[in-house]
From Swiss-Prot:
One of its GO terms (molecular function) is GTPase activity. Belongs to the TRAFAC class translation factor GTPase superfamily. Classic translation factor GTPase family. EF-G/EF-2 subfamily. This is Elongation factor G. Catalyzes the GTP-dependent ribosomal translocation step during translation elongation. During this step, the ribosome changes from the pre-translocational (PRE) to the post-translocational (POST) state as the newly formed A-site-bound peptidyl-tRNA and P-site-bound deacylated tRNA move to the P and E sites, respectively. Catalyzes the coordinated movement of the two tRNA molecules, the mRNA and conformational changes in the ribosome. GTP binds at residues 17-24, 85-89, 139-142. It is found in: Cytoplasm. It comes from Porphyromonas gingivalis (strain ATCC 33277 / DSM 20709 / CIP 103683 / JCM 12257 / NCTC 11834 / 2561). InterPro entries: EFG_II (IPR041095), EFG_III (IPR009022), EFG_III/V (IPR035647), EFG_IV (IPR047872), EFG_V (IPR035649), EFG_V-like (IPR000640), EFTu-like_2 (IPR004161), G_TR_CS (IPR031157). It comes from the Bacteria. The keyword Translocase does not apply. The lineage of its organism: Bacteria, Pseudomonadati, Bacteroidota, Bacteroidia, Bacteroidales.
Length: 707
């Protein structure tokens, strides 16, 4: 029972937001107020505890997800908070994705001036995907142009959320000094002398009473929609609703993802962080609020297995991050969903089907490890000793295997060629790249078979900059880099039906496979690379050879017919075929499928696909014409323009990534440094034939196949 109680008072939460909304500063204040640090670290000084990589401290941004355990007393009860500080920059979106997969709740931070920005929209959608309940925190209330109510409106209109303010600010910009708590109807005013560690509870200032009552009524109305008991009281006599009932209704609505309680503050000025911690304890779920976790049987993917969130169940944990630590080596971060994980124990990896011994366990404080004997149910920890582990692997009891749903990561959109400067660097390069690729599923390393060049690919220029920086600092590798390359893909336009026969006679046993198949673009509602359909009747191709045909097509799709770019969104239907009782084997059918793919794609009007980026430019009115003119030259499509609250203009456009290299510098020149831009991946689209021919000529591809 004590363990269940401990679960009840545990919170696994993340802070997510657009870049520069103040996530790391908020995390630093949480560490300060919970007593984990005795001095506040500032991002702009390069001293933030959560930003522990040198590149993070230099650039003032968060790159990796730092995990920290803190404790907070609320209502005479000690709560354990596992806090993950995630990056806001779009190039590191994988860090957000894998953190949300294992969190129970999240704090969505918004800038009181910028409001809902492109990356805040991206992370909000990621949280929706993983059903993560959120509370909203409008930060930077002390800045010029801060407007809490405008941000609340944007949440409703841009994100389609149901924001429910439980506080309103007292003052704004330089006069911001506290908040009105709409639940207790008291004013909370922060004390500057104590670095914001203490605040005074006062009566609401007379000039705010009317506004506070109006917003309290809106809060109660929102809650009444989610809670039938409260609805009756709200319509009979709202004054009879108690504080405890409001808190219970807020928690219930948040857990059901019907509402998002909204708070405000200024983390940098030490105002609003304690009430945010209280709200985390009050409204966000504990591991016990998710009574079961679902997975599948490794031997039968259609069989669903449920595990209760209990220490008495067999072990079930998910590895969500791999990191290389200079002191302890390969570190695996995981979340325990059921059972317990003692140090020195063996665990079964459902993907590799191997047992691994975890030699040591840690609870993390940023990049420092605190040794632990056991990581309990519902907790987040890190371990060393794994030989073969990847992000998304399920760790379980060998006698009770289970596979949790893994994580999908986006394909890289940009690549650069790298070559070591000296022979000594060459030896270290392979080791460094392999370790970095283990840590980051959106980072890929390939060797060009023709030129022997090593090409590294990632989510953006900043992503690759930091990889090269880490090679230099952590692995002591100096390398030259080529110009950025776009990660093109290939696709086909037309359906093709063909017969492919593979026959080889070498004396003795030969090779034979015969396939009749239809190759065409995948169905519109299909998500993934290969949509494979088996329509073979009467055993003309034995069932044991069908997976080899599928494997052959999957292998072939990694190198398209135009210039060896990968191909996805393909549908292959195996209609018929034949086999030889002696000469046919799995390899014969795999090779036959490889040949069928090549011959079919050449006839199916192949086309080149390029990544299209969603671009948002904030520019002064007088530069708008130049900005739009420049986007038109870059094959951009302007989708809309609107005015920001600060009087600037916001231009929204879709632009091919190939045209966007060096855009930040060009934009600075056009607008005399007064504009900013954010870019996120949108989708892949067909390259116009004239440009496709240029690209294929440079890549020494099959220009003759482009119509």
């Amino acid at each position: 029972m004590a363990i269940d109680k401990e679960l009840q008072f545990t919170r696994n939460i993340g802070i997510m937001a657009h870049i520069d909304a103040g996530k790391t500063t908020t995390s630093e204040r949480i560490l300060f107020y919970t007593g984990l640090t005795h001095k506040i670290g500032e991002v702009h000084d390069g001293a933030a505890t959560m930003d522990w990589m040198e590149q993070e401290q230099e650039r003032g941004i968060t790159i990796t997800s730092a995990a920290t355990t803190a404790f907070w007393n609320y209502n005479n009860q000690k709560y354990k908070i596992n806090l993950i500080d995630t990056p806001g920059h779009v190039d590191f979106t994988v860090e957000v994705e894998r953190s949300l997969r294992i969190l129970d709740g999240a704090v969505a931070a918004f800038c009181a001036v910028g409001g809902v920005e492109p990356q805040s929209e991206t992370v909000w959608r990621q949280a929706e995907k993983y059903n993560v309940p959120r509370i909203g925190y409008v930060n930077k209330m002390d800045r010029s142009g801060a407007n809490f109510f405008e941000v609340v409106r944007q949440l409703r209109e841009v994100l389609g959320a149901n924001p429910c303010p439980i506080q309103i600010p007292i003052g704004a910009e330089e006069t911001f000094k506290g908040v009105v708590d709409l639940v207790s109807m008291k004013a909370l005013v922060w004390n500057d002398e104590t670095m914001g560690a203490k605040y005074d509870v006062e009566d609401i200032p007379a000039e705010l009473v009317g506004e506070a009552e109006e917003w309290r009524d809106k809060m109660l109305e929102t809650l009444a929609d989610c809670d039938d008991t409260l609805m009756e009281k709200y319509f009979d006599d709202p004054s009879t609703i108690t504080e405890d009932e409001i808190i219970a209704a807020l928690r219930k609505g948040t857990l059901a993802m019907q509402i998002n309680p909204m708070l405000c503050g200024s983390s940098f000025k030490n105002k609003g962080v304690q009430t945010l911690l209280d709200a985390v304890c009050k409204f966000l779920p504990s591991p016990a609020d998710t009574p079961t976790v679902e997975g599948t049987d490794p031997s039968d993917p259609n069989k669903v297995i449920e595990r209760k969130t209990s220490p008495n169940e067999p072990l079930c944990a998910l590895a969500f991050k791999i990191a290389t630590d200079p002191y302890v080596g390969r570190l695996c971060f995981f979340r325990v969903y059921s059972g317990e994980l003692p140090a020195g124990s063996y665990v079964y990896n459902a993907r590799s089907e191997k047992k691994e011994r975890i030699s040591r366990l840690f609870q993390m404080h940023s990049n420092k490890q605190n040794p632990k004997e056991v990581i309990g149910c519902g907790d987040i920890g890190a371990g060393v000793g794994f030989k073969d582990i990847r992000t998304g692997d399920t760790l379980c009891d060998e006698n009770h295997p289970i596979v949790l749903e893994s994580m999908d990561f986006p394909d890289p959109v940009i690549g650069i060629a790298v070559e070591p400067k000296t022979q000594k660097d060459l030896d270290r390069l392979g080791v460094g790249l392999a370790k970095l690729a283990e840590e980051d599923p959106t980072f890929r390393v390939q060797t060009n078979e023709d030129s022997g060049q090593t090409v590294i690919s990632g989510m953006g220029e900043l992503h690759l900059d930091i990889i090269i920086d880490r090679l230099r600092r952590e692995f002591k590798v100096e390398c030259n880099q080529g110009r950025p390359q776009v990660s093109y893909k290939e696709a086909i336009n037309d359906p093709v039906e063909l017969r492919e026969v593979y026959k080889k006679q070498t004396g003795g046993r030969g090779k034979f496979a015969d396939i009749i198949c239809r190759v065409e673009p995948a169905d519109a509602d299909f998500e993934g690379e290969l949509q494979f359909v088996d329509e073979v009747k009467g055993g003309n191709i034995p069932k044991e050879f069908i997976p080899s045909i599928q494997k052959g097509f999957q292998r072939a799709m990694k190198n398209g017919v135009l210039a060896g770019y990968p191909l996805d969104q393909l549908k292959v239907t195996v209609i018929d075929g034949s086999f030889h009782p002696v000469d046919s084997d799995q390899l014969s059918f795999e090779i036959c499928a490889l040949q069928a793919f090549k011959n079919a794609c050449e006839k199916a009007h192949p086309t080149l696909m390029e990544p299209i980026m969603k671009l948002e430019v904030v520019t002064p009115e007088e530069s708008m014409g130049d900005v739009i003119g420049d986007l038109n030259k870059r094959r951009g499509q302007v989708e809309g323009m609107e005015s920001s609250r600060t009087g600037a203009r916001i231009v929204k456009a879709k632009v091919p990534l190939a045209e966007m290299f060096g855009y930040v510098t060009a934009l600075r020149t056009i607008t005399s440094g007064r504009a900013t831009s954010t870019m996120t991946f949108s989708h892949y689209s067909e390259v116009p034939s004239t440009i496709a021919k240029q690209v294929l000529t440079e890549a020494q591809g099959r220009v003759d196949l482009i119509k």
